[in-house]
From Swiss-Prot:
GO terms for biological process: calcium ion transmembrane transport; calcium ion transport; chemical synaptic transmission; positive regulation of muscle contraction. The record marks L492 as: Required for CaMK2D-binding. It comes from Bos taurus. This is Voltage-dependent L-type calcium channel subunit beta-2. Residues 432-446 have a biased composition (Polar residues). GO terms for molecular function: high voltage-gated calcium channel activity. Pfam families: Guanylate_kin, VGCC_beta4Aa_N. Residues 472-487 have a biased composition (Basic residues).
């Protein structure tokens, strides 16, 4: 009987196991459904991969600067597995197109980074909400288990801050903070309780509004597709020392990156182009009533023009009159490359200013204070610091940085010609509006006549790198506009001076003795900057403007002379700088020697 009981138990076990294996076996319908899902997933992945390949040759639709960091390591819903792009805060992304509501197609602007999938703002917002939900649940469980309220707050705050940008990158309009509220010291911005501190509920209520406001920060800020280059230093623009040193760099960049660069002049005060001002109509009247030399309409027009130039993916360099400090552009959407032209020794700068004559030495204190403010800035505010003593070394330093930036923005996979370049240059000459033209020739015409209109200078800069058919078509219209302005203004603008000067006159600007150079240099820079023109004594002003007045007496002869010189200098520059090992190299060496003699005075 014991044996039969044992056999019965064994049979029961066998029958139970067979029943369990029978019920766990999937049916044919389940198998087919699973196969259909897999086939759909593979087809969607194949289509996403094909769209990704096509996007490599498409132009950049727009660019963004990230305010948050994102890691794709644990992302499981990427259209193509392993093709999501990770980034840190303050990185730059080129967006090619929208894939769906959750993903964009683009690339990180870094050398060696290829195209991939970028999370859209909608997806990042959903991720943030999920993260907050999990954080609240964790806080609820920890408080329910008897945890300390201060420690739970300390656990939540650092984790929530990881997904938000530093307070300096907060969009003021999105948070509702004014500019004054946003400039809070760093030690008061994000109070973080230490492990040994005890946090009262009252202090916790004071802290939480800061974190609530930063939650509304947009993950991306739209910026120009190519970050514009802006030069600051060694002192104030409008004085001979700063203008001369920056002019030498502009000349170098114009020829070194010929065909890849647009150098355009900006007379409007683009420091007014803060997101908090342009996006808030209530602040427009305040700005308009203030004593500013630029209207918001003019500023907005200049910002749009810079964005349009950047769409061609050419290097964009701004000769901005009003920008003398990196903080002026920190809250704008331009995201510029700030280049600091630095003279390390204040004594050298002081002696250099005094060597330019009494008219410059009279404003010595103003220039020294401006130079000191730049010297006190942390290095993180600048992208490039040019503190070399030789022109050639400073130029090569800047050229190396811009070459690396060019490679980062032009990956090998997108080496095909940009259709936006020819289309933008052929269809858009970026004309100046009647308001801008009247402003430049009206009440402020005496101060800004020689600077010219921004739209015209941009079209002239574009002529340097546009195709030959487009160049011929634009040359006729730009020449007519140039001749019209030269007859009505008191003197030639700086752009016209650069276009019309020959190689001999350009070399003489570096090689003339200091006494002669100070007067010749003043003719180039005194009219188009505010400081020298506005505060110039009568005697010096009469001498400086003698030649422009003489030129304006005979506009017909001046037009023919400028037109012939413009064409001749353009052909010369093209022939001269195509061969880097030939005559162009010798000229650069001569300029380097003259920079060392004229600009930097040994102690």
């Amino acid at each position: 009987m014991q044996c039969c009981g044992l056999v019965h138990r064994r049979r029961a076990r066998v029958s139970y196991g067979s029943a369990d294996s029978y019920t766990s076996r999937p049916s044919d319908s389940d198998v087919s459904l699973e196969e259909d899902r897999e086939a759909v997933r593979r087809e969607a992945e194949r289509q996403a991969q094909a769209q990704l390949e096509k996007a490599k040759t498409k132009p950049v639709a727009f660019a963004v600067r990230t305010n948050v960091s994102y890691s794709a390591a644990h992302e499981d819903d990427v259209p193509v597995p392993g093709m999501a792009i990770s980034f840190e805060a303050k990185d730059f992304l080129h967006v090619k197109e929208k894939f769906n509501n959750d993903w964009w197609i683009g690339r990180l602007v870094k050398e060696g980074c290829e195209i991939g999938f970028i999370p859209s703002p909608v997806k990042l917002e959903n991720m943030r909400l999920q993260h907050e939900q999990r954080a609240k649940q964790g806080k609820f469980y920890s408080s329910k288990s008897g945890g300390n309220s201060s420690s739970s707050l300390g656990d939540i705050v650092p984790s929530s801050r990881k997904s938000t940008p530093p307070s300096s990158a907060i969009d003021i309009d999105a948070t509702g903070l004014d500019a004054e509220d946003n400039d809070i010291p760093a030690n008061h911005r994000s109070p973080k309780p230490s492990a040994n501190s005890v946090t009262s509920p009252h202090s916790k209520e004071k802290r939480m509004p800061f974190f609530k406001k930063t939650e509304h920060t947009p993950p991306y800020d739209v910026v120009p597709s190519m970050r514009p280059v802006v030069l600051v230093g060694p002192s104030l623009k409008g004085y001979e020392v700063t203008d001369m040193m920056q002019k030498a760099l502009f000349d170098f960049l114009k020829h070194r990156f010929e065909g890849r660069i647009s150098i355009t002049r900006v007379t409007a005060d683009i420091s007014l182009a803060k997101r908090s001002v342009l996006n808030n109509p209530s602040k427009h009247a305040i700005i308009e009533r203030s004593n500013t030399r630029s209207s918001l309409a003019e500023v907005q027009s200049e910002i749009e023009r810079i964005f349009e130039l950047a769409r061609t993916l050419q290097l964009v360099v701004l000769d901005a009159d009003t920008i003398n400090h990196p903080a002026q552009l920190s809250k704008t959407s331009l995201a510029p490359i700030i280049v600091y032209v630095k003279i390390s020794s204040p004594k050298v700068l002081q002696r250099l200013i005094k060597s330019r004559g009494k008219s410059q030495a009279k404003h010595l204190n103003v220039q020294m204070v401006a130079a000191d403010k730049l010297a006190q800035c942390p290095p993180e505010l600048f992208d490039v610091i040019l503190d070399e003593n030789q022109l050639e070394d400073a130029c090569e330093h800047l050229a190396d940085y811009l070459e690396a930036y060019w490679k980062a923005t032009h990956p090998p996979s997108s080496s095909l010609p940009n259709p936006l370049l020819s289309r933008t240059l052929a269809t858009s000459t970026l004309p100046v509006s009647p308001t801008l033209a009247s402003n430049s020739q009206g009440s402020q015409g005496d101060q800004r006549t020689d600077r010219g209109a921004p739209g015209r200078s941009a079209s002239q800069a574009e002529e340097e790198h546009c195709p030959e058919p487009v160049k011929k078509a634009q040359h006729r219209s730009s020449t007519q506009h140039h001749n019209h302005r030269s007859g009505t203004s008191r003197g030639l603008s700086r752009q016209e001076t650069l276009d019309s000067e020959t190689q001999e006159s350009r070399d003489s600007a570096y090689a003339e003795p200091k006494e002669e150079y100070s007067h010749e240099h003043a003719d180039h820079y005194a009219p188009h900057r505010d400081h020298n023109h506005r505060e110039e004594p009568h005697g010096g002003g009469e001498h400086r403007h003698r030649e422009p007045r003489h030129r304006s007496r005979d506009p017909d002869r001046e037009q023919d002379h400028n037109e012939s010189n413009k064409q001749r200098s353009r052909h010369k520059s093209k022939d001269r700088y195509c061969d880097k090992d030939g005559e162009g190299l010798s000229r650069r060496r001569n300029e380097a020697a003259d920079w060392n003699r004229d600009v930097y005075i040994r102690q």
